[in-house]
């Protein structure tokens, strides 16, 4: 523990890392503050019905992603999900449409163009989602407006504020990515999830203590043990890698010999990280948009897709998670490009011919590790529904797996790795190691 505290002190000694940590804390604090700023014209005391509506089902998950901003009718009520939806569409277009395929191969300039299109599409989605949210608010809490304000007058400025709030969250996320620590978008989602954890934990403890005579305390201990096991399994999933050995040919430059060393290509078991589950969850929110307009006439199928504990919801969810895992892995890792880079640098995989055979070998290995990875991630994704079989409270069950847990684990590990890289670059031990200053690559004790 002493070494860990010393390492935290080392984080503060590095000026660049200190600034990044402070910027991250500042922007996340701004995001949390905005989650409590209610839309102008709304009477917060009249939102009980909207908050009760988000206490269960898929609406509760959407509210958790926004850190409670959805049920508070805040300026950040739509959260970051419109941007996630736009990203899904652009990822699909980058695979299916030649124009975007070419753009994706243009490197940094192409990435900036795709990012611009993603922002434009985000605005288009917000033009639809903001009025949809306000119509739902009107149905659930028609008397939520302050005295003297009509819904007709309220709709247009409120739509602009909601859209601007969501775009501001996107801006915060991008600034955190550029100037802070970790992936800003994922970090903002994680902050929203963590904000709901204390309340969910208290509700679960209270519920179990009330049933202490019927074994409630024992069940709570069992829940914590299961939660611990699931967290450990999730960490192994995120960190698991398959190393492919690469041998580099020896070459003589002057009187010095270079190359000849064996290195490894670390293919992650879950190369797509948390993106497939975020994308799948974003698509599962589509039934909400349908029901907002015709809640009474919604079909049984749509109603089941809104219940994150129903069989249909979880079957569709598993299929989407597996599909997005393969899809995102395919667009993230390019075996052909990896094989070409290896050949260009006089590298080869022992026993495999350079070029096409190497690309096929890497692709085969990727397919073999992606299948178990996608199945395991799908199992983790439906763990909240399985936790419901143990009568775990709806809010607390979300932390047993699924989107919430994987985002928490993935974002924390990603942020720690970035902090670790800053420490190692400046000759300190990593965050999870001893914390002593290194000199010339050797720890100084």
Q: Where do the language-model regions lie?
A:
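N-terminal cationic and glycine-rich segments that engage phosphates or anionic surfaces
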Residues: 1-104, 109-445
């Amino acid at each position: 523990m002493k070494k860990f505290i010393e390492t935290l002190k080392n984080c503060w000694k590095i000026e660049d890392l200190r600034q990044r940590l402070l910027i991250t804390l500042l922007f996340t604090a701004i995001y949390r503050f905005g989650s409590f700023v209610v839309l102008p014209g709304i009477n917060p005391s009249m939102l009980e019905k909207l908050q009760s509506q988000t206490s269960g089902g898929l609406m509760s998950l959407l509210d958790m992603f926004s850190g409670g901003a959805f049920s508070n009718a805040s300026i950040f009520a739509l959260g970051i999900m419109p941007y996630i939806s736009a990203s899904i569409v652009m990822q699909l277009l980058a695979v299916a449409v030649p124009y975007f395929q070419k753009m994706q191969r243009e490197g940094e300039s192409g990435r900036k163009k795709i990012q611009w299109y993603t922002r434009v599409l985000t605005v288009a989605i917000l033009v639809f989602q903001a009025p949809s949210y306000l119509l739902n608010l009107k149905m659930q809490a028609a008397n939520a407006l302050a005295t003297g304000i009509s819904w007709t007058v309220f709709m247009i400025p409120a739509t602009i504020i909601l859209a601007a709030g969501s775009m501001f969250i996107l801006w915060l996320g991008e600034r955190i990515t550029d100037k802070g620590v970790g992936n800003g978008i994922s970090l903002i989602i994680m902050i929203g999830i963590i904000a709901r954890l204390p309340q969910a934990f208290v509700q679960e403890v209270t519920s179990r203590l009330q049933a202490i005579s019927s074994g409630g305390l024992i069940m709570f201990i069992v829940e914590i043990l299961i939660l611990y096991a699931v967290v450990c399994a999730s960490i192994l999933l995120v960190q698991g890698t398959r190393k492919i050995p690469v041998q580099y040919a020896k070459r003589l430059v002057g009187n010095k010999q270079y190359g000849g060393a064996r290195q490894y290509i670390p293919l992650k078991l879950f190369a797509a990280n948390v993106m497939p589950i975020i994308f799948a969850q974003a698509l599962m929110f589509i039934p909400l948009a349908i029901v907002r307009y015709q809640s009474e006439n919604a079909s049984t199928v749509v109603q089941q897709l809104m219940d994150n504990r129903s069989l249909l919801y979880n079957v569709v969810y598993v299929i989407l998670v597996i599909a997005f895992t393969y899809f995102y892995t395919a667009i993230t890792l390019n075996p052909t490009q990896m094989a070409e880079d290896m050949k260009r640098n006089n590298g080869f995989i022992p026993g495999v011919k350079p070029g096409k055979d190497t690309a096929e070998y890497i692709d085969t290995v990727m397919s073999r590790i992606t299948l178990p990875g996608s199945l395991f991630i799908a199992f983790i994704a439906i763990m909240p529904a399985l936790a419901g079989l143990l009568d775990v409270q709806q809010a607390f069950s979300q932390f047993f797996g699924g989107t919430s847990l994987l985002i928490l684990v993935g974002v924390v590990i990603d942020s720690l790795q970035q902090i670790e890289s800053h420490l190692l670059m400046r000759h300190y031990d990593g965050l999870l190691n001893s914390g002593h200053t290194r000199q010339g690559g050797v720890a100084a004790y």
